């Protein structure tokens, strides 16, 4: 398990009781404490971030009944959900491919995880948020939604996450609920790197070097901490007048010209 870097967490966020939907990748671990779904282990980082208790569980985001149980379990354990953070995602590991090669099953698999799961999590979390007249939803999309990306299911589903977030923000503002979406750029995570090793004969080192070269800020990919800080800030009262925003966290790659 990874230690929390010095200075990574300045203070607990002021919107406790977050529900983080996703916990197997580097990005998830930095946001809720190190949760490895294979081992279901948690480290104290979550207490540093959120200043409270931590619980982990298994959820199939492609199954509505599983999501409904997750929400009910969270409400039963903590009494409320102030923050819903939807983070589960898949691309090549789900069988994604260019549009001319994608199968119907693979397209359905990727979109059910990346988009439908978020819709269903919001569906079941919103009643309690509306009742308490407060809540924050932080979704994870991708810069792939706004840029050229060869794999159709991932790009389509992540574009849908942005549209979903905008709809959530407008429809729920009168209940005091905010919704924003983060668009990670090129990240140095296992999902991003390992799935590309071997494609076109590239080594891991070549994959990393090529991705690093495309980032203007520091010529280096972002880390899970970069996304974590953005998510924690959006979830806090420091971002209390921000809703419906799509926030790129990409080291300037989206504004690169030429």
Region locations from a protein language model:
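Short C-terminal tail/terminal secondary-structure segment
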Residues: 91, 95-96, 243-258
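Substrate-binding pocket helix/loop in short-chain dehydrogenase/reductase
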Residues: 95-99, 103-108, 211
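Active-site helix of classical SDR
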Residues: 122, 157, 165
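Alpha-helical segment proximal to the catalytic Tyr-Lys
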Residues: 127, 170-171, 240
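Residue(s) in the substrate-gating loop at a strand-loop-helix junction
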Residues: 142
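Short, small/polar-rich loop/turn modules that mediate ligand/substrate recognition or access, typified
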Residues: 173, 178, 242-244
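C-terminal helical subdomain
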Residues: 181, 204-238, 242, 249-251
């Amino acid at each position: 398990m990874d230690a929390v870097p010095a200075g990574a967490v300045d203070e607990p966020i002021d919107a406790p009781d977050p529900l983080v939907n996703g916990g197997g990748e580097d990005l998830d671990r930095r946001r809720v404490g190190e949760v490895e779904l294979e081992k279901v282990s948690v480290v104290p980082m979550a207490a540093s971030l959120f200043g409270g208790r931590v619980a982990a569980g298994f959820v199939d985001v492609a199954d509505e009944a599983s999501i409904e149980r997750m929400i009910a379990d969270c409400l039963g354990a903590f009494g409320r959900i102030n923050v819903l953070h939807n983070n589960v995602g898949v691309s090549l590991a789900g069988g994604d491919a260019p549009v001319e090669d994608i199968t119907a099953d693979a397209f359905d698999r990727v979109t059910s995880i990346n988009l439908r799961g978020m819709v269903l999590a919001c569906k079941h979390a919103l009643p309690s948020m509306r009742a308490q007249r407060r809540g924050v939803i932080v979704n994870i999309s991708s810069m792939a939604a706004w840029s050229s990306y060869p794999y159709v299911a991932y790009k389509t589903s992540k574009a849908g996450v942005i549209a979903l977030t905008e709809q959530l923000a407008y429809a729920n503002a009168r209940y005091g609920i905010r919704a924003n979406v983060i668009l990670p750029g090129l990240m140095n995570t296992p999902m991003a790197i390992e799935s590309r090793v071997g494609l076109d004969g590239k080594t891991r080192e070549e994959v990393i070097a090529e991705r690093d070269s495309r980032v203007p800020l520091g010529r280096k990919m972002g880390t899970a901490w970069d996304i974590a800080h953005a998510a924690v800030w959006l979830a806090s009262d420091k971002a209390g007048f921000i809703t419906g925003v799509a926030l790129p966290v990409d080291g300037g790659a989206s504004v690169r010209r030429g």
